Regions:
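Short beta-strand-centered aromatic/proline hotspots
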Residues: 134-142
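Glycine-centered loop/turn positions within well-structured domains
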Residues: 146
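Acidic-enriched and Gly/Ser
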Residues: 1-124, 149-173
Length: 174
């Protein structure tokens, strides 16, 4: 299959226009993911709950390469697509990584943390029990606690809260 015809998750960058682009994509019926979360901020001396992007400036668009590029070229969306460092082609996130990322951000926002993408790689693991059952990622230690990291290659990683060792199984490399 030609790369332009294959459907996948592409990653775009924008500057402070996540909500606008999210709304535009929704109106056009384009599958996308722009995660937001609630934070408490002090505004004019008062503490208020506000919604802000979970990952500043990033927008995930599902489609083929051609349709994604058309959003910029034909519709003038204020964003640009990130490129894979090694191939220089548009950065595409594998479906399983994206499914796990969406699940964690949508359902467990208060139990995850965002980390830079350059974490030291550990064993590949799958969570087999508990809240995060089915999630695959890398086993790491942060502050002496076992956590599973879901890595979006070349972007960032998110880590679960502590996971007991009995809830994990090692995934053999293929």
């Amino acid at each position: 299959m030609v790369e332009n015809d294959s459907i996948g998750w592409y990653v775009a960058k924008t500057y402070r226009q996540e909500r606008k682009i999210k709304d535009l994509l929704a109106r056009m019926g384009i599958e996308h993911f722009v995660p937001f979360h609630q934070v408490v901020k002090e505004i004019n001396g008062k503490r208020k709950k506000v919604e802000e992007p979970f990952v500043n400036g990033l927008i995930f668009v599902r489609g083929n390469k051609k349709s994604c590029i058309e959003l910029i070229n034909e519709y003038g969306y204020p964003m640009r697509y990130l490129r894979d460092f090694s191939t220089r082609s548009l950065l595409r996130v594998p479906d399983k990584q994206m499914e796990d990322f969406i699940y964690l951000v949508d359902r467990h926002e208060n139990e995850i943390e965002l980390f830079p993408h350059d974490l030291k790689r550990g064993d590949r693991v799958r969570v087999v029990a508990g809240t995060f059952a089915g999630i695959e990622g890398e086993l790491i230690r942060i502050a002496c606690h076992r956590r599973v990291v879901v890595r979006l290659e070349n972007l960032f990683s998110i880590a679960t809260v502590f996971i007991p060792g009995g809830y994990l199984e090692k995934i053999c490399d293929r």
